[in-house]
Amino acid sequence: CTLSLLFSSQFAALSIAFGGTLSGLFLAFISTDMWTPWSVFFSLSPIGMDYDKASRLMSLSLRSIPISDIFLSLLYLIGTFLLGLLLFTRAEQGEALFSLHRQNVSHSLHSSLSPEFIKLKRNPIWIPFLLIPLISALIGTVNFVQNQGVLQYTWEDLWTQQSLFLGMFFLAPLIGILCSLLWRMEHQGSNWNLILTITSPGKLLRDKWFTATLLSTLCMVWISFIYLLSGKILGLPGAVPAIFWMRMLSAILSIAAITALQSTLSMFFHSFALPIALAFLGSLVGLTLTVKGAYYALPYSTLIYGMGSTSITGELNFPILLLSCSFYIFAALGIGILYLKKSDVRTHV
């Protein structure tokens, strides 16, 4: 609530929340100190996880919650409530405390850019796509260095530590945030009436899909760059596994399928948060399907399978992955275009 009060952009508040959740999840594994409210949340779980380095087996068990953890969570609750109350009482009506829309863009620059990119120029979209992979890589690298008794000093094990939670839980919801942001303006007021009279449904959906795919692909390039740079800094022996590049291509294809699906969902639903929640649910279902061997069933599962976060040198059936991703791209875009063509413009108000 305090983040939503501080930032007028839902995107900024959600991005910080995702980053905090990722940090808290990693801190729960590598440290017993609770530095953030998100790590406090994980510490209150009645389920404990133990890892035996000798046998490399992980076990789950019920545990009692320490009084100190409960006390610290109450301190966070009271502290953030009082901070939010103070900020709310001092804020002027109708103004955001931190405006993220102060940059003026010239008309000549606007004319050379796609309307979808112009929208994103006024949003801090770079924050989660830069910081969350960086946080994941930094914490994963620390975990990699500190657990050499369990992990091997190889490129393969470094990749599993840097990309494990990113590929399984966080990348798809990030794409969901981006797609919801791209469709937010269309769902405001009577903008549908204007937009659908000046552009075709096919071009509208195609432009949004292309924009989301391009930016998400740049995020994958950033993830790859961090991985390669950190491996060189650590002085890992040997070369990067040759299959790594095929993994990145598979991830980009999966991202294209996810952006097509998420863009269509964001077009259907007026709610900003619902498609994001569906993306997170899709990641959980995708993880289950991947474990059961049905990685081709959903684009969320092809992303987990294609990235190879659990084993970069594992099996990769690229033709099946390509067929699955192509199906979801054409199906999602086709359904979206057909929906826009058959719907009355007034129904979108």
Task: Enumerate the language-model features and the residues they cover.
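Terminal transmembrane helical anchor/hairpin motif
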Residues: 19-99, 142-158, 280-349
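Secretory targeting signals
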Residues: 1-10, 25, 45-68, 130-181, ...
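Hydrophobic/aromatic residues in alpha-helical transmembrane segments
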Residues: 79-84, 175-179, 188, 226, ...
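Helix-loop-helix units of permease transmembrane domains in multi-pass membrane transporters
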Residues: 180-214
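Transmembrane alpha-helices and adjacent helix-loop boundaries
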Residues: 10-11, 186, 257-261, 285-290
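Aromatic- and glycine-rich beta-strand/loop motifs that create alpha-glucan
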Residues: 92-130
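Pore- or pathway-lining transmembrane helices of multi-pass membrane proteins that form conduits
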Residues: 8-28, 129-132, 269-287
